Regions:
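Extreme N-terminal starter segment of soluble prokaryotic enzymes
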Residues: 1-4
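A short, glycine/small-residue-rich beta-strand->loop->alpha-helix junction that serves as a flexible
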Residues: 7-19, 218
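Conserved N-terminal ligand/cofactor-binding loop architecture of enzyme catalytic domains
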Residues: 20-100
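Proline-aspartate-enriched helix->loop->beta-strand connector
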Residues: 101, 105-107
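Short His-centered aromatic/hydrophobic patch
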Residues: 112-115
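Active-site-proximal region of nucleotide-activated glycan assembly enzymes
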Residues: 126-188
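Donor-nucleotide binding loops and adjacent catalytic segments primarily
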Residues: 192-193, 201-244
Length: 244
């Protein structure tokens, strides 16, 4: 059985979830039967730029505008109006991704991004490929963009995500609450004092971890300053990904 794991590099979360699934699968099946790809590598340059770069720009610099369109397009009536043109745009810009899937003909496609759901489901509806399509939803709250006819199973973060999907019209029998995929490395127990020593931390101080995702999205610097101004003894570890 051949497995294809697909993500889109619009932020780092979709990629990390896909990599976690990849790591877990490699513990169970032969390496030659598992492939992992970034679907945006199989699109045209302009589409990739919009998806991967402008997304981060909007979230960081124009969060109110981003939020407005996010919630607007999550209204059932509005989404129904844009569903077909959205599908056309995805299909037209993802021809090379379609070709990759048809050439490799996986038995199972596991997607951590809704764009891949749309493309693979389109191939299934047109009887171009016969495979299982599993969607690992990387958001805690559901958006209509994740809802695609042709997805066989949804693996979701929490019970609330499951309820959201059911509210979107998905059968409860297709939804499994598994949590967001994380690397098997996080299941390994480590000695806290050894880790603090490795990073040059004071073993006697309370330690807080601030995570801004793979691209340092959000007011991370402001948050650090405000916590640093508190009259308490603590030390901070800050993960800001590629944001230098």
């Amino acid at each position: 059985m051949k497995y294809l794991i697909v993500y889109a590099s619009a932020g780092a979360g979709h990629r990390k979830a896909a990599e976690a699934i990849h790591e877990a699968l490699l513990e169970r099946v032969d390496k030659k039967d598992v492939a992992i790809i970034d679907s945006l590598d199989y699109t045209n340059a302009f589409f990739r730029w919009i998806y991967a770069r402008k997304y981060i720009t909007f979230v960081n610099d124009l969060p109110n505008i981003w939020g407005f369109f996010y919630y607007l397009l999550n209204i059932r009536l509005i989404y129904r109006l844009i569903r077909f043109p959205r599908r056309v745009v995805n299909v037209l810009n993802c021809r090379r991704f379609e070709d990759f899937v048809l050439k490799n003909r996986p038995d199972v496609v596991i997607s951590t991004h809704f764009m891949a759901n749309e493309i693979v489901a389109h191939l299934k509806r047109n009887n171009k490929i016969n495979c299982r399509l599993y969607s690992a939803v990387t958001d805690y709250r559901m958006h209509f963009f994740w809802v695609t006819l042709g997805v066989d199973c949804y693996f979701v973060a929490a019970e609330q995500t499951r309820k959201d999907l059911i509210g979107c019209g998905i059968s409860k029998d297709k939804i499994f609450v598994t949590g967001i995929p994380i690397s098997p490395k996080f299941s390994v127990s480590l000695n806290k004092q050894d880790v603090k020593s490795k990073f040059g931390l004071d073993a006697s101080l309370f330690t807080a971890l601030i995570i801004g995702g793979g691209f340092g999205v959000g007011p991370v610097e402001e948050l650090v300053k405000k916590i640093g101004a508190l009259k308490i003894d603590l030390q901070l570890l800050v993960v800001c990904g590629y944001n230098e």
